[in-house]
Amino acid sequence: MSAPSETLLPVRLLPPCLLIVTVEVDIEVEADWNRWYDDVHLPDALACPGVRAGRRYVSSGEVSESDRGEQRRLRTRLYTTVYELDAPSAVETKEFAAMRGWGRFGPRVRSQTRVVVAVG
């Protein structure tokens, strides 16, 4: 059963493509990174051709993840943004390539990006 603070969203058809970005952020830069992401990066990404929507999520505390049978516990919060795209080519536009700012956080922000394409 869902916690009272959660909202059940209606089921929708999978868009043609999803871009899923998962990020670990060191606590020392977390507030600055969140300001930049919310005020600059996310609006810039949503303005790119072929990007339909984006939604951010954050873990409530430590998380455990497994990859190919290996399990690890993260002591940092885990951020995930899911973007709905018209096609995988949306990440290849000049507007998407022109987005800047991620590098200023250097090794304090570690990310993994996946593109998921709907079949059928």
Give short role names for the model-derived ranges.
Residues 1-120:
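Macromolecular interaction modules
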